[in-house]
Regions:
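Short amphipathic beta-strand/extended segments with alternating polar/hydrophobic composition
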Residues: 146-166, 195-199, 221-233, 379-383
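Stable alpha-helical structural segments in soluble proteins, enriched in small hydrophobic residues
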Residues: 38, 81-93, 383-393
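Gly/serine-rich nucleotide phosphate-binding loop at the start of the catalytic core
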Residues: 1-81
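Substrate-contacting helices/loops that form the catalytic groove of nucleic-acid
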Residues: 47-56, 60, 177-181, 185-202, ...
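Positively charged, low-complexity nucleic-acid-binding target-recognition regions
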Residues: 2-7, 191-192, 318, 324-425
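Acidic carboxylate diad motif detector
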Residues: 55-176
């Protein structure tokens, strides 16, 4: 086993009273004011001189001048931590500029300097607390902010903070205007164990009808395993919310709607967008967790995934990218696999659906998601693509595979028992 130190985040929902809500808004507004003022100064310096100020001490030096009221409210430690957060953002901007000059970014990836904590002309409250400035009482479920001597009840169970050897880091408290709730996000440094044994290799192809197609190398029995995760529920969710959002858009475009009705409709509009996003993210999380568990069961140690680069630019629209958001799915898979000690590698997936994984010849697309090889065998198109990705990663292509199908939903992953006349691979 190899021990690797990583940073993870625990999210807690804060249970506030009107008094606590006023306190959080006051402190959060002051922190947002600091971030906006400092980013305005640095952005102006960047656009006028081309120089990038990424030092946290330049903001710290102004604590007794223009930032004194914020400094007095936040305290020395938390003010310094907010300055470090601003510095981290500008260091990231500098790194992206260097990557763009070296040609490491795609042409459509535009690099912009850090912006402002504002929405609809109002500051978005945010509270930043240093690692030693708070304490989490897991028994009483209280978040204690030391400088202000305030206890805030919370709900939820931290996943990473309770692990042995976990080290708490920066705390960020934010307000969700759609849900009208406060959330505390704890940065936690933990040590994960990564397996170094020679497990099986596997390939992953991401798609539309089949959200994930996963194929392993042949096991000791000489047979591989293919796992297919359907994208039907995800697509159904998208079209359901799209229809609901379109109805509200029609009502908003009606000039007869009164101002009060419009404010309510806009609130519903934002809630539907947020709910659709949450459903999608939860489907991704459930599918990734289930697949990681299957990898451990099948003794898979390394996984190769086909990277979908440029899809949103080459084939934009809801049919390809709007609902599936492949990059987020890929990042979710990478994080979940890392948590389970499984290595994930990205390789190009160009042409993997057009070539037979066994013979290397061009295949003919048939109805119902099948491809036909000139040598006579028929294979599921997504299984064939996953095999090609596995092959590109240096894995062995199985001659026969056992196919298992699953339906990932926002609540769980459902196994599908299908009776097939023959092996689709």
């Amino acid at each position: 086993m190899q021990r690797v130190s990583v940073v993870r985040t625990d999210t807690l929902r804060l249970l506030t009273t009107p008094e606590l809500d006023d306190f959080l808004r006051r402190v959060g507004d002051a922190t947002a004011k600091l971030i906006n003022m400092e980013n305005y100064r640095r952005r102006r310096q960047f656009f006028e001189t081309g120089k990038i100020d990424y030092s946290w001490q330049s903001a710290w030096a102004r604590r007794f001048a223009e930032y004194y009221s914020v400094y007095k409210l936040l305290g020395s430690k938390n003010f310094a931590e907010a300055c470090r957060l601003i510095s981290d953002q500008w260091k990231s901007f500098l790194g992206l500029l260097k990557a763009a000059k070296e040609g490491k970014l795609e042409p459509w990836q535009k690099v912009r300097p850090p912006g402002y904590k504002k929405r609809d002309g109002q500051r978005i409250p945010i509270i930043i607390v240093r690692a030693d400035g708070y304490r989490v009482d897991l028994e009483r479920k209280l978040l204690y902010l030391k400088y202000w001597n305030v206890n805030i009840p919370f709900t939820g169970k931290p996943r990473w903070l309770i692990k042995q050897g976990a080290k708490q880091g920066r705390l960020i408290i934010t307000y969700d205007p759609v849900k009208k709730r406060w959330y505390a996000r704890l940065s936690v440094e933990v040590v994960l164990e990564r397996r170094l044994d020679n497990g099986l290799k596997a390939g992953i192809d991401l798609g539309r009808e089949r959200l994930i197609a996963f194929v392993t190398e042949p096991s000791e029995k000489g047979e591989g395993v293919a796992l297919l995760y359907r994208g039907g529920p995800l697509k159904a969710d998208y079209f359901y919310f799209e229809r609901r959002i379109a109805e509200i858009d029609r009502m908003l475009s009606d000039p007869r709607s009164e101002e009060m009705d419009r404010s309510v409709l806009k609130e519903m509009h934002r809630r539907l967008y947020e709910k659709r996003k949450r459903h999608r993210d939860q489907v991704f999380a459930n599918a990734a967790a289930h697949l990681a568990g299957m990898c451990l069961e099948l003794k898979v140690g390394a996984v190769f995934i086909g990277g979908l680069r440029g899809l949103a630019q080459d084939k934009p629209g809801k049919g390809n990218t709007n609902v599936w958001s492949y990059r987020k799915l890929e990042m979710r898979l990478a994080t979940t696999f890392e948590n389970h000690g499984i290595a994930l590698f990205e390789i190009p997936e160009d042409g993997t659906s057009k070539v037979c994984a066994r013979h290397g010849c061009e295949v003919v697309r048939k109805p119902r998601g099948l491809v036909r090889c000139p040598h006579g065998h028929v294979m599921h198109a997504d299984v064939n693509a996953a095999m090609n990705i596995l092959k590109r990663g240096g894995g062995r292509v199985p001659q026969r595979v056992k196919v298992l199908s699953f339906i990932p939903t926002a609540s769980k992953v459902i196994a599908v028992n299908e009776k097939k006349n023959g092996n689709p691979a």
